[in-house]
Amino acid sequence: MDARILQDNDDTSLPVNQASVTRIHKKPGKAEAEAAVRTLLLWAGEDPDREGLLETPKRVAKAYQELFGGYSESPEEVLGTTFEEVAGYDDMVLVKDISFFSHCEHHMVPIIGKAHVAYLPEGRVVGLSKIARVVDIFARRLQTQESITAQIADSMQRILKPRGVAVMIEAEHMCMAMRSIRKQGSSTITTTFTGDFKEKADQQVRFMTLIRT
């Protein structure tokens, strides 16, 4: 299949675990996606023509379109509208317990967790729902937890230009719970700090204290 090369060192809307040179192939059509699901059913030992599976290829293709909808969205669009009339407020803005789901890029099984996101505004703020939307944009892609954490922080720092951003993610990985070592209930915690959150220990302490209260 022919491929074209796209180079963009500043595009954090792309997963950060991709190289700055990203190979983009022609996107398959709906029929090709459904055929791929049918092939997987056959490979698993199933009969895709039995009654219960007749519509499965269509359903899976439709579900994947929603589950991986983050590829068609960008944080620039979501964070582009800000408000400057904040009566001089310049302290921490924290949105915690943002539930999300993603999919492991290694096994394509779910990652389920919650994100805590804070920033220190520099003269302007963004709608609170926009922060949750940014989490979803990056979560609805094939990911690693480390990448999601960094992408949220990097995009907010780059677009909003605040004095700092703090992100913590707590999640359970079904690739650990459902396969291999099969350890249900274990969680992974990742953090990323920029600006004042990275340079000032007291700001990190405030962030960590607030998300635990």
From Swiss-Prot:
Molecular function per GO: GTP binding; GTP cyclohydrolase I activity; zinc ion binding
One GO biological process term: tetrahydrofolate biosynthetic process
Enzyme Commission number(s) of this protein: 3.5.4.16
Reactions that this protein is recorded to catalyse: GTP + H2O = 7,8-dihydroneopterin 3'-triphosphate + formate + H(+)
Keyword Flavoprotein: no
Keyword flag Iron: no
Record PROSITE patterns: GTP_CYCLOHYDROL_1_1
Cellular component terms (Gene Ontology): cytoplasm
Keyword line: GTP-binding, Hydrolase, Metal-binding, Nucleotide-binding, One-carbon metabolism, Zinc
Record pathway: Cofactor biosynthesis; 7,8-dihydroneopterin triphosphate biosynthesis; 7,8-dihydroneopterin triphosphate from GTP: step 1/1
One Pfam family this sequence matches: GTP_cyclohydroI
Subunit composition and interactions: Homomer.
Family to which this protein belongs: Belongs to the GTP cyclohydrolase I family.
Name recorded for this polypeptide: GTP cyclohydrolase 1
Lineage: Bacteria, Pseudomonadati, Pseudomonadota, Alphaproteobacteria, Hyphomicrobiales
Encoding gene per record: folE
